[in-house]
């Protein structure tokens, strides 16, 4: 499990505390922090800029000359080989003196960066260039966690991104994330609220839990949808709620940032909400399309002998009779209970 200190700071008062000292104290007190990850580590002096114009290089067909507004009195000129740039776009700019990571390793804890590149002004085929515009990879950002951003060429930022701001202020690159190595006896800490309560107890800090309220309206759910438990010895509670008139779209940026801090790829507001709640309170949950659930009924049961399921990652999985599944009204397994949904 990962713990974003920005997120944690909304639940418990950790303002002014040193992240490394906090990690050491938590570890000594039985809440081991395996790694302290700084997502923006290796990025220095990279700011946002707006492309004012794009012209062809006079002596190189594969190069373009861009004039950019980076929040200074005069525009800066950057020469690039990227073909996806055009006037009006907001892009990350690493000007002379800036630093960017040399590499991004998805297999390392938190996608740790290796090496460092210092940007210098220079000339490309005789034309001055004040630095470089950056791609996702050049900023050390895991493309898998940013499905809404372009993965090829220069990173094109949302059009409402302010000009001249440090890239660290975007996508929580200025966050600090703990990669936890929690043991089975501390399952209470496998959630942000659990970590907030533990952090508050250890450091004697005030904890403020989110206020939750639900307004029920519309037709009663009775007769429209139902849930059942066929294995009460293994599933103590199974409940559901029917949500109507849902418009599927992109989640707010702050939710996407919090999911990314845990290595979870944002999908859409429905899937993201389920993943967010799981991280916040530690309770796995899954969303189903009401129109596609046979019989509008769900039952928690053990898997049948030889039963298989195709999970959301596209993999066909052989189930064991000891596995709990959620089955629809046709008795087809629709989800591996508490683990992963299926088709």
Segments predicted by a language model, with ranges:
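Phosphate-backbone binding interfaces of nucleic-acid-interacting proteins
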Residues: 1-219
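Glycine/proline-enriched, intrinsically flexible loops and inter-domain linkers
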Residues: 5, 11, 24, 64, ...
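A generic local secondary-structure boundary/capping motif
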Residues: 40, 80-83, 120-124, 165-170, ...
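Conserved mixed alpha/beta core segments that line enzyme active sites in large multi-domain catalysts
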Residues: 50-78, 163-164, 257, 274-343
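Structural motif
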Residues: 76-77, 90-92, 130-132, 206, ...
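Short helix/loop capping segments that flank catalytic or ligand/cofactor-binding pockets
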Residues: 78, 87-89, 101-104, 142-144, ...
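A short, flexible low-complexity segment enriched in Lys/Arg and Gly/Pro that occurs
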Residues: 97, 166-176, 244-249, 305-323
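Short, solvent-exposed loop/turn segments at the edges of secondary structure
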Residues: 128, 173-175, 236-238, 320-321, ...
């Amino acid at each position: 499990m990962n713990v974003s200190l920005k997120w944690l700071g909304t639940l418990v008062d950790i303002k002014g505390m040193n992240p490394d000292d906090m990690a050491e104290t938590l570890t000594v007190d039985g809440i081991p922090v395996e790694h302290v990850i700084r997502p923006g580590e290796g990025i220095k002096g990279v700011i946002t800029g707006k492309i004012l114009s794009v012209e062809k290089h006079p002596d190189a067909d594969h190069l373009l000359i861009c004039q950019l507004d980076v929040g200074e009195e005069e525009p800066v000129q950057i020469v690039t080989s990227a073909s996806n740039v055009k006037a009006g776009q907001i892009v990350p700019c690493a000007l002379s003196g800036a630093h960017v990571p040399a590499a991004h390793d998805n297999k390392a804890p938190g996608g740790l960066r290796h090496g460092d590149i210092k940007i210098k002004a220079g000339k490309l085929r005789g034309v001055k260039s004040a630095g470089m515009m950056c791609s996702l990879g050049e900023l050390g950002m895991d493309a898998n966690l940013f499905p809404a951003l372009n993965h090829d060429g220069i990173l094109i930022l949302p059009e409402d991104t302010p000009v001249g701001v440090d890239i660290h202020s975007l996508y929580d690159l200025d966050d600090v994330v703990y990669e936890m190595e929690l043991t089975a006896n501390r399952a209470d800490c496998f959630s942000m609220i659990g970590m907030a309560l533990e952090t508050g107890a250890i450091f004697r800090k005030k904890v403020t839990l989110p206020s939750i309220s639900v307004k029920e309206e519309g037709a009663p759910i009775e007769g429209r949808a139902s849930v059942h438990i066929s294995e009460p010895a293994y599933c103590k509670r199974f409940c559901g709620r029917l949500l109507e008139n849902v418009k599927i779209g992109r989640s707010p940026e702050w939710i996407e940032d919090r999911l990314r801090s845990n290595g979870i790829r944002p999908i859409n507001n429905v899937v993201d909400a389920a993943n967010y709640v799981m991280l916040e309170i530690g309770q796995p949950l899954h969303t189903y399309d009401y129109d596609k659930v046979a019989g509008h009924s769900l039952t928690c049961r053990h898997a049948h002998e030889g039963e298989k399921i195709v999970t959301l990652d596209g993999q066909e999985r052989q189930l064991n009779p000891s596995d709990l599944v959620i089955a629809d009204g046709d008795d087809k397994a629709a989800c591996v209970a508490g683990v992963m949904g299926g088709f």
